């Protein structure tokens, strides 16, 4: 039977908010991305609170905060436990994105929405499943029968277009892809595996975008012209970038340009970030996910493209200040100037008219970078002031420092007393257990002595022994030696009542002395306390201060497109090439989504186009029923199959039956027909009602008869492709208002029935040309 497919947009619908979607296949729940906005608006994640614990899997398409930024929050606060799937670069670079975001926020405020432990729990080996491109992975448990596959999407390293398949129903989830090859990444690969899916989920936010440069070479030249001009004019260049995504393309371009222009050695290029070393290290180890150009360069020159010779990698502003006093090109996060070193350098350099701030990515609306660009683009915008609120950590001084040290000393003393209290409780517990053991031993000894006295008293009453024999000692028994044994065996001395044997404790090096243990434990506590005191003395206590700054904008501001996403024309062409049966449009304004919807209706045959709102649930269940049957050998041997995509298709006429002792239906040739034996129901209704309810017999036919069937033409062909086939056969063809005119004798046009199925009409004069054209047309399909 058909799977029940439901789709809910939790965020990123009819606007450009971060992507976060819930896809339900029967009772299996998949979360598609879990993004966070630039201003860290965690209220956008509130819809996840009700569904987080029922999510079974999370598919991550990209590694930046726009796609994974909310994941630690949902894991830490809402208790998401599902397995997370993504490529290896998404794992590595995603960790860097989240670490950098956390540290940047902590440098400005007390960020408590999630911790570093929450980030680590998202990407732990027990939680995150790494996949390679085109790797088919079959889910288990509740997801049995569902397979997921990531395909190359471009844009950022490891970015994926996901294909989710169950039975014959396939879903393609594709957002933020790039159709152009770049220095370190290949473009989106439209392989046959992702064409003609049952459902395509894609974004429409870039449909109104146009390419400023038709070639990447022209784009690179424009970038370096601006950088060269500003450096030679004596100014610095600040390029706000992301942490570990699009910055890699910029680094590669700048490194190649600097290596070809020796005169630029006078100027420094710096990749500045708290985790910039780790980002470059991970990039060097992920060549398999990069472009073929990068791989070939490594194989031929044995030189990793991300082993930079002309770019300095620094992790703090203090290291930047130690560089020679020359003009610099600084690439640092974040790209929106909301956090990180880019914001701090902007505050320092914005008043310098020689400084150039170069934005290379799309800027989030209402961010500091967006306000800056809008002000700069207005008449006389340069020179005006802009107000920002800046938080920073400063060392404590005076009374605040004294109060802090007193609180820390108090906490250390409380911790020490708590440690001593726990140790005292442990000692008391050990003593209590030893006392219980002694009492149990004493009770057992008293019982044995009482039993012996009773036996002696009974023997005395019977006259077996007298009082003298009771006190007689066996001469063959000795306290230290057994004279009855073949040799003397030394026995240990056993303490007698009221003294008890002490239970000795053994460690790695033999018997332990209690007093020595206690002294060592006290010494360890003192050592730990001393170490903590030393650590605390090394750390300089700081506090967050917030101040409002009024900054004059005298610097120069330029933008250039290095976003690495497809433009509107390419988006429409890609959707047309994928040719989905159903289409869901997300992440775009209503006007952008409407533009794609109109284009699809005019150029693609679909059974439904959906533009959901946030919180709206779509029922996308297929109208095709799928059944699993066992085929008998007698039936399989008669099949004549045709290869269509990944399937073998054949038309059969058979009978479904369920064998005795089995619940699996079996399909066999039509040789017998089951009928209900109800002939005598009217006569024996009162007497045999219960016996006739389930009475079924088989009426066997002597021969297998079939009435044949109408041929089914399976496949699809464009009229433009058919025109080329006819031209190659020597037939004169031309388009006339959507109709193929074949020499004025035969006309071919396309139509649709009420179900949306394609119909190709052929009309014309009966002639040799007519039959030839019909034969060529038939060859374009599989006929069953």
From Swiss-Prot:
InterPro entries: Beta_Casp, CPSF2, Cpsf2_C, CPSF2_MBL, Metallo-B-lactamas, RibonucZ/Hydroxyglut_hydro, RMMBL. SMART domains: Beta-Casp, Lactamase_B. It is found in: Nucleus. It comes from the Eukaryota. GO terms for biological process: mRNA 3'-end processing by stem-loop binding and cleavage. The keyword Nucleus applies. One of its GO terms (cellular component) is mRNA cleavage and polyadenylation specificity factor complex. GO terms for molecular function: RNA binding. Keywords: mRNA processing, Nucleus, RNA-binding. The keyword Disulfide bond does not apply. Pfam families: Beta-Casp (PF10996), CPSF100_C (PF13299), Lactamase_B_6 (PF16661), RMMBL (PF07521). Residues 676-695 are annotated as: Disordered. Belongs to the metallo-beta-lactamase superfamily. RNA-metabolizing metallo-beta-lactamase-like family. CPSF2/YSH1 subfamily. CPSF is a heterotetramer composed of four distinct subunits 160, 100, 70 and 30 kDa. Component of the cleavage and polyadenylation specificity factor (CPSF) complex that play a key role in pre-mRNA 3'-end formation, recognizing the AAUAAA signal sequence and interacting with poly(A) polymerase and other factors to bring about cleavage and poly(A) addition. This is Cleavage and polyadenylation specificity factor subunit 2. It comes from Dictyostelium discoideum (Social amoeba). The gene is cpsf2.
